[in-house]
């Protein structure tokens, strides 16, 4: 396990711990307290991850793993800048026109993950191209995503879990 994978797993663990601790607190913290938390912890607490969350965390992962320039300030980018960056890397489809606040569906996350990992599953996808549906099936088959409905919106903690598995898969490659 590399240092990067360990770091991402630690971030995920901290996020999940924060969710657990927050569930024990009777008075939810105010927006001011939440704004001081790391983005990964704030996202882990969300019942539904957004497209903006996914784009931000995938860009951070790509920067951490050297897929994009380490000097790139992904935290300072707006949604359209993140979209352009991920589109340039081939992680998102050019036809996507999502609202940043839209819920992140499992099949969309699977497409991003399969593209990030450069997964080329089979004959049909080599002919017709990668789709969100087949990406989701392939990510499930590889154990990178859990079973569920493809159009179901993922939680923040599920988003972090999938990204951690992606990081581990990427780091285990020669």
Could you say what each language-model-derived stretch is?
Residues 2-5, 23-70, 96-174:
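Terminal recognition/anchoring or ligand-binding modules at protein termini
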Residues 9-20:
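Bacterial N-terminal signal peptides
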Residues 14-16, 92, 165-169:
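N-terminal processing/targeting junctions
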Residues 72-91, 99-106:
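Acidic helix-start/capping segments at beta-turn-to-alpha-helix junctions
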């Amino acid at each position: 396990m590399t240092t990067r994978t360990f770091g991402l797993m630690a971030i995920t663990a901290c996020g999940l711990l924060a969710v657990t601790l927050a569930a024990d607190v009777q008075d939810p913290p105010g927006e001011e307290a939440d704004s001081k938390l790391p983005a990964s912890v704030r996202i882990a607490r969300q019942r539904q991850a957004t497209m903006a969350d996914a784009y931000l965390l995938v860009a951070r992962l790509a920067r951490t793993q050297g897929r994009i320039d380490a000097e790139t300030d992904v935290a300072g980018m707006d949604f359209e800048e993140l979209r352009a960056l991920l589109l340039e890397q081939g992680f998102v489809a050019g036809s996507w026109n999502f609202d940043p606040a839209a819920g992140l569906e499992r099949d969309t996350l699977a497409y991003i993950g399969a593209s990030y990992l450069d997964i080329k599953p089979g004959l049909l996808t080599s002919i017709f191209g990668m789709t969100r549906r087949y990406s989701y099936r392939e990510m499930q088959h590889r154990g990178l995503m859990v079973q569920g409905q493809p159009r179901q919106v993922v939680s923040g903690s599920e988003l972090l879990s999938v990204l951690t598995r992606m990081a581990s898969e990427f780091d285990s490659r020669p």
